[in-house]
Amino acid sequence: MAKLQVSLKARALRYLSAREHSRQELARKLARYAQEGDDIEALLDTLEAANFMSEARFSESLVNRRAARFGNSRILSELKSHNIDPDSLTEIKAALAQDEVARAREVWTRKFGVAASDANGRAKQMRFLLQRGFSHRAIQAAMRAKEENED
């Protein structure tokens, strides 16, 4: 039995029905299946015009998926890697900055729960949060607040 050839548009819609994709990400995924004469850019333009694909929805989706586990710099870095508009990045950065300390505290609590008793332990906890993309200011505020709660 012959395998059915799925059109690029059908493939794109299948990808987009699972989750939001950036233009760059969807183009990369579709490029594997493109045949000679297929115009991926025109297809992506059509999908954007029909509002099947949206940079704003993708950005919002990515932020919602990542915010509970990662800090601002990691999220913004990932958005930049998807070629998101710099103006949108500025708005997202401002929105993320409002609750970074609370998110850092929550991630720290899930991972460690109690403040370290020595300098090496504190450094380990701070490195963990730094690797997750939280700022020094947010890390210090989160750890300071946790230590005050324990006293």
From Swiss-Prot:
Pfam families: RecX_HTH1, RecX_HTH3
Keywords tagged on the record: Cytoplasm
GO annotation terms (biological process): regulation of DNA repair
UniProt-listed Gene3D superfamilies: Winged helix-like DNA-binding domain superfamily/Winged helix DNA-binding domain (1.10.10.10)
Matching InterPro entries: RecX_HTH_1st, RecX_HTH_3rd, Regulatory_RecX, WH-like_DNA-bd_sf
Compartments where located: Cytoplasm
A cellular-component GO term for this protein: cytoplasm
Domain of life where this protein originates: Bacteria
Cross-referenced PANTHER family: REGULATORY PROTEIN RECX FAMILY PROTEIN
Protein's name in the database: Regulatory protein RecX
Naturally occurring in which organism (per UniProt): Herminiimonas arsenicoxydans
